[in-house]
Amino acid sequence: MAGRGKAIGSSAAKKATSRSSKAGLQFPVGRIARFLKAGKYAERVGAGAPVYLAAVLEYLAAEVLELAGNAARDNKKTRIVPRHIQLAVRNDEELSRLLGAVTIANGGVMPNIHNLLLPKKAGSSAKAAAADDE
């Protein structure tokens, strides 16, 4: 019966590594797997599905955080607030399409002034007045 089971004297227990660290992710693969199973989205959940979903969620979070950080820096702030997330999402075409129906609490509205309400430029109005006189 040689080669079966663990040796009696070996105490070299292998350290457990999480699925997140195996995949090189920060988002919790195990927790996402648990949510997928508990949510009854399907009868069975494949082994790769929670890893893939965690990677997608991590990418989206990193993208939003990067754009929101840029918006905060543009406003000379060091802390990201919901307003910066709103500006980041709405100024990005793809994220705006993805989160179009989402309301961000305390995000405010996008700054927009209709072209008809803007003051006319002095140079163009002087040329138009000269053309009317002739």
Curated annotation (Swiss-Prot):
One of its GO terms (molecular function) is protein heterodimerization activity. The keyword DNA-binding applies. Pfam families: Histone, Histone_H2A_C. It is found in: Nucleus; Chromosome. PROSITE patterns: HISTONE_H2A. GO terms for cellular component: nucleosome; nucleus. Its main location: nucleus. Keywords: Chromosome, DNA-binding, Nucleosome core, Nucleus. GO terms for biological process: heterochromatin formation. InterPro entries: Histone-fold (IPR009072), Histone_H2A (IPR002119), Histone_H2A/H2B/H3 (IPR007125), Histone_H2A_C (IPR032454), Histone_H2A_CS (IPR032458). Core component of nucleosome. Nucleosomes wrap and compact DNA into chromatin, limiting DNA accessibility to the cellular machineries which require DNA as a template. Histones thereby play a central role in transcription regulation, DNA repair, DNA replication and chromosomal stability. DNA accessibility is regulated via a complex set of post-translational modifications of histones, also called histone code, and nucleosome remodeling. Belongs to the histone H2A family. The nucleosome is a histone octamer containing two molecules each of H2A, H2B, H3 and H4 assembled in one H3-H4 heterotetramer and two H2A-H2B heterodimers. The octamer wraps approximately 147 bp of DNA. This is Probable histone H2A.3.
